[in-house]
Amino acid sequence: MKLIVSVMPRSLEEAQALDATRYLDADIIEWRADYLPKEAILQVAPAIFEKFAGRELVFTLRTRSEGGEIDLSPEEYIHLIKEVAQFYQPDYIDFEYYSYKDVFEEMLDFPNLVLSYHNFQETPENMMEILSELTILNPKLVKVAVMAHTEQDVLDLMNYTRGFKTLNPEQEYVTISMGKVGKVSRITADVTGSSWSFASLDEVSAPGQISLASMKKIREILDEA
């Protein structure tokens, strides 16, 4: 289980002020570029990639329809992703498949896609269909984050993940039950078959995130013989 921490600067000045040494315990950095005005993203990109040079990095534009901070037309979304990919080669690129399915074909040349689905309202009844459709597309990683309201919501997602991982051992998954009741899904990633778990440093990027320090301790305990 790799631990991912998001950076969410809201300006070039905030990006330049980031102290990369505070993120050394994170295995992967996620740049949530949606916290910036869309016209500032490409201006801030050099500072982010210089700051975290040599680190694994996920480039993410989380749109409002999936719980993020930005609204982008399909053309704007694809343009920003392609520009960042061309000039900075992030290790992973998050792609909101269900929000931008109509332009997905333009991303087929990218081998490092994280195909993602986010639902901040509920754990939908068609989770099996969602996981199945994303798996068939054979991305680098399938990411599903849904809101849990009951313990059964959490158990359902964990069981679906374990089942899909068993049937597709070469496919990497990240599944998250958001919210307080879903915290257990964040610490049992290795059991359910998730490759990553998201943690927070100063600011959470999703409900129910656990601090990086706590997640590191939990991982150490779980890794003990």
Curated annotation (Swiss-Prot):
Its EC number(s): 4.2.1.10
Root EC class: lyase
Known pathway: Metabolic intermediate biosynthesis; chorismate biosynthesis; chorismate from D-erythrose 4-phosphate and phosphoenolpyruvate: step 3/7
Molecular function GO labels: 3-dehydroquinate dehydratase activity
Membrane-crossing residue ranges in chain numbering: none
Residues the record lists as binding 3-dehydroquinate: 6, 30-32, 62, 186, 205, 209
Active-site residues, record numbering mapped to chain: 118 (proton donor/acceptor), 143 (schiff-base intermediate with substrate)
Amino-acid biosynthesis found in the keyword field: yes
Catalytic activity: 3-dehydroquinate = 3-dehydroshikimate + H2O
Keyword Oxidoreductase: no
Keywords tagged on the record: Amino-acid biosynthesis, Aromatic amino acid biosynthesis, Lyase, Schiff base
GO biological process: 3,4-dihydroxybenzoate biosynthetic process; amino acid biosynthetic process; aromatic amino acid family biosynthetic process; chorismate biosynthetic process
Gene3D superfamilies: Aldolase class I (3.20.20.70)
Database matches in PANTHER family: 3-DEHYDROQUINATE DEHYDRATASE
Function: Involved in the third step of the chorismate pathway, which leads to the biosynthesis of aromatic amino acids. Catalyzes the cis-dehydration of 3-dehydroquinate (DHQ) and introduces the first double bond of the aromatic ring to yield 3-dehydroshikimate.
Family recorded in the similarity comment: Belongs to the type-I 3-dehydroquinase family.
UniProt subunit comment: Homodimer.
The protein's name in its UniProt record: 3-dehydroquinate dehydratase
Source organism of the structure: Streptococcus pneumoniae (strain Hungary19A-6)
